[in-house]
């Protein structure tokens, strides 16, 4: 009987990718099979996020919920950014944890588990062996028509509020050829859409063979687009400072590059952006968007926003609201500032009452939601090209797919359509999703 591993993932798409790789490593080395039920697991892993305090504390709450399973001999591990940040402190706070490992050492999981058994004590490895992780991962195994591919790790921007450079290290790019080989392997398995991942993905500079030359992100996109079977290319997350003219021009040269971009701005006040050490102004950010939309008028934009950064005044907040109106974002991830230990912003004086921050967050989200609904309503009556991803989460009798602009569409259809690119006419708009019906025959397809 095979051993079972339960993996709970917190945070970003990079963590989702890493969780898949944990399962692959454990399956290849020790025969583990994934399970969705922690009660059936022989090994429970938490792949953690430390971007906000709430996410970090939830990890320890969840650890408490599975502690009783130790009586059955279940092994428990903590990986990801909380593991990287806290290290041995996790063992002190939760001594029943067996292994602690960082994002860069997940490939060593089998070794850590073997050492735990041999030495009868918890094992911790939160080192930064740079790109070694990718050299020791088994070939990607996927189910479905879309897949993530990590092309780089870490971030070297050191924004004043962010823990990523401390938990994932500085920027390290995978070799150019390695990325192309992985994408080609996924295409051979039927993948039609790839999402290229990195904390600062557009800073990619990958080694090209034994030469001193480096491939930038725009060149990588061109080569990925040439791989047979790949029909759509997405990427996340990008930094405004790295959005070069070459990358903007890629949207004119590469039709497979989708008309959707997640480009975190974080704020709309130049004073706050400077305090955040973001390295650009609101005007420079909007200039990048204007250039992109000159090439792709239908470009859908999403962003991250931090409300209540230390020293944020009502005037600063209104500047952020103006930027939101000017850009007309299609989606956002918005949060109240959460001071992270060890970052410069954690030491800044903050005298804004929490109720003021909460009111601002609610006001911001209300405007974003209004924009999202308006954009959704504009799609009604158009025909959208979808990649059908699976059964609808809203209604098990329907299917769901995603438009080029990253909008989910639910529609009635046969399961044989899963994994296919199809045309769907939009019949109804909701704030975050659309409803539609499959188009039969030849119909002019709108991009969306």
Swiss-Prot record:
Main location: cytoplasm
Keyword Cell membrane: no
Keywords assigned by UniProt, alphabetized: 4Fe-4S, Cytoplasm, Iron, Iron-sulfur, Metal-binding, S-adenosyl-L-methionine, Transferase, tRNA processing
A single GO molecular function term of this UniProt record: 4 iron, 4 sulfur cluster binding
Residues involved in [4Fe-4S] cluster 1 binding: 12, 49, 81
Alphabetical list of PROSITE patterns matching this protein: MTTASE_N, MTTASE_RADICAL, RADICAL_SAM, TRAM
Name of the protein in its database record: tRNA-2-methylthio-N(6)-dimethylallyladenosine synthase
Domain TRAM: 377-440
Family: Belongs to the methylthiotransferase family. MiaB subfamily.
SMART domains, per database record: Elp3
Record note on cofactor: Binds 2 [4Fe-4S] clusters. One cluster is coordinated with 3 cysteines and an exchangeable S-adenosyl-L-methionine.
Endoplasmic reticulum in keyword set: no
Subcellular location as annotated: Cytoplasm
Record: residues binding [4Fe-4S] cluster 2: 155, 159, 162
Lineage: Bacteria, Pseudomonadati, Pseudomonadota, Betaproteobacteria, Burkholderiales
Primary role: Catalyzes the methylthiolation of N6-(dimethylallyl)adenosine (i(6)A), leading to the formation of 2-methylthio-N6-(dimethylallyl)adenosine (ms(2)i(6)A) at position 37 in tRNAs that read codons beginning with uridine.
EC number: 2.8.4.3
Residue intervals of the MTTase N-terminal domain: 3-118
